[in-house]
Curated annotation (Swiss-Prot):
It is found in: Membrane. GO terms for cellular component: membrane. Belongs to the cytochrome P450 family. It is an enzyme of class 1 (oxidoreductase). CDD domains: CYP71-like. Heme binds at residue 442. This is Cytochrome P450 CYP736A12. GO terms for molecular function: heme binding; iron ion binding; monooxygenase activity; oxidoreductase activity, acting on paired donors, with incorporation or reduction of molecular oxygen.
Length: 500
């Protein structure tokens, strides 16, 4: 999304700037914008963001304030860094900031404005979100896949148990990613893999591409030049992905006509698409093949890179803090016992486990800058003018580490801070926004929470975990990398010991 280092590119842009600057219209200078860094012509403050933009923006906010104005390329950008400011943008004035900017990756690899995640606010987006919430992600639908989640998790626990017997080192990051991938594909497709195509491979390629910094998203006049070669890659990957999705939809339609529908999400979407137009009238009008494919991509991209990154960081913190790990195990042993494994029905009774999950999401929100919002009209907030089509970035990472909210130990992993607290992760408490809030809050939040809690509880209950190769909790590498999500740079490796 943002550059790691593009010094030559920025030098060239800086040289161009003195020629192009006179023809660029300034922002409405007679209005009072929020304070912020001045930036350079053309590139604005892009060159300052570094490898971890959420950390850079937090540092800048300490200087300029919780509502900060800057230019990223030619895009006027507002950075929100306090719970009070986040509430203004995501609740009080949510109707103004509910849109999304147009991004090249979405245009070429996610059917433009046909899906939900990247679509501008309007009737089409409202209908698609309504369909996803009321048809695909209902509590009943989520509960109907309890057996699938149990089966997939059981398979991975079995493989880790075998590694435990052999005293082998386990790549926990890879194991968790495999669990989430398999659960997601079974939810969507009714199966985890098919030798006739490599959906996992092409989706991983698409997600990697989408997470790369694309100068054309910030300096649009450079788009046609494709100086990074990304446009060509977006188009090529999008075409190959479309071919696979078309094959999958054709197969589901054939199975449905033969009475062999499996009841997965694609079957649900095709069922609505094929209903008479007087049934679910507004929804049936907008659900076509392109929309179905866009929703498929939305669900895969929203599930795979988010839940596994959350679980990876929560397990990392527990291994780094053995006292918290032991406390989790003691609670689960008391509630569940040691004669069976944790089930979803146990989760409401595992209060400390949920505190651990909340603390992990506070310190390591998977999308530290959430999804970018875009203002749909001019507005004044706290005396500051926010121009129409400004890009709004909510620094969820900074919200979760604000010492004014979380006290001076905000950087510490301390699940007990949630003891007796009503602060939750569902978007009502603006100091903790791992899933966003308002109209653009994550519609799959409940499914994501269930999945994260279940996987963490099962792996903690079934195994003791020790660090390999002389690594200790004190020197465990906690370095993160920035993209669509913010996973660990190095995979989490540990030696399991089965305890049930």
């Amino acid at each position: 999304m943002f550059p790691l280092a593009y010094p030559l590119l920025f030098v060239l842009l800086g040289a161009l700037s003195w020629w192009i600057l006179p023809i660029i219209s300034p922002l409405k200078r007679h209005h009072k914008l929020p304070p912020g860094p001045r930036g350079l012509p053309i590139i604005g403050s892009l060159h300052t963001l570094g490898a971890l933009p959420h950390r850079t923006l937090q540092t800048l906010a300490k200087k300029y304030g919780p509502i900060m104005s800057m230019r990223l390329g030619s895009v006027p950008t507002i950075v929100v860094s306090s719970p009070q400011a986040a509430e203004l943008f995501l609740k009080t004035h949510d109707n103004i900031f509910a849109s999304r900017p147009k991004l090249q990756a979405a245009e070429y690899m996610s059917y433009g404005t046909m899906g939900m995640s990247f679509t501008a606010y309007g009737p089409h987006w409202r209908n698609i979100r309504k369909f996803v919430v009321l048809e695909l992600l209902t509590p009943a639908k989520i509960n109907s896949f309890v057996g699938m989640r149990r089966e997939e998790l059981g398979t991975v626990v079995k493989s880790i148990k075998e590694a435990s017997a052999a005293n082998e080192v386990v790549d926990l990051s890879a194991k968790v990613a495999n669990i989430i991938e398999n659960m997601t594909y079974r939810l969507l497709l009714g199966r985890t893999k098919d030798d006739r195509y490599d959906l996992k491979g092409i989706m991983n390629e698409a997600l990697t591409l989408a997470g790369r910094f694309n100068i054309a998203d910030f300096v649009p006049f450079l788009g046609p030049l494709d100086i990074q070669g990304l446009t060509r890659q977006f188009k090529d990957t999008g075409k190959r992905l479309d071919k696979i999705l078309e094959f999958i939809i054709d197969e589901h339609e054939q199975n449905s006509s033969n009475g062999n529908a499996s009841g997965d999400f694609i079957d649900d979407m095709l069922s609505l698409k094929n209903k008479p137009s007087n049934t679910h009238d507004e929804l049936s009008k907008v659900i076509d093949r392109s929309v179905i494919k866009a929703i498929m991509i939305d669900i895969i991209s929203a599930a795979i890179d988010t839940s596994d990154t959350s679980i990876e960081w929560i397990l990392t913190e527990l291994i780094k803090h053995p006292r918290a790990m032991k406390k989790c195990q003691e609670e689960i042993d008391a509630v569940v016992g040691v004669d069976r494994m944790v089930e979803e029905t146990d989760l409401p009774n595992l209060e400390y486990v949920y505190m651990v999950v909340k603390e992990g999401l506070r310190l390591h929100p998977v999308a530290p800058l959430l999804g970018p919002h875009e203002s749909m009209e001019d507005i004044t907030i706290n005396g500051y003018f926010i121009p129409k089509q400004s890009r709004v970035i909510v620094n969820s990472w900074a919200l979760g580490r604000d010492p004014n909210v979380w006290s001076e130990n905000a950087e510490e992993f301390l699940p007990e801070r949630f003891e007796g607290s009503n602060v939750d992760v569902r978007g009502r408490d603006f100091q903790l926004l791992p899933f966003g809030s308002g109209r653009r809050g994550c519609p799959g939040m409940q499914l994501g929470l269930i999945t994260v809690q279940l996987v963490v509880a099962r792996l903690v209950h079934c195994f003791d975990w020790n660090l390999p190769n002389g690594t200790t909790p004190d020197n465990l590498d906690m370095t993160e990398k920035f993209g669509l999500t913010t996973p660990r740079v190095k995979h989490l490796l540990a030696v399991p010991k089965y305890r049930l």
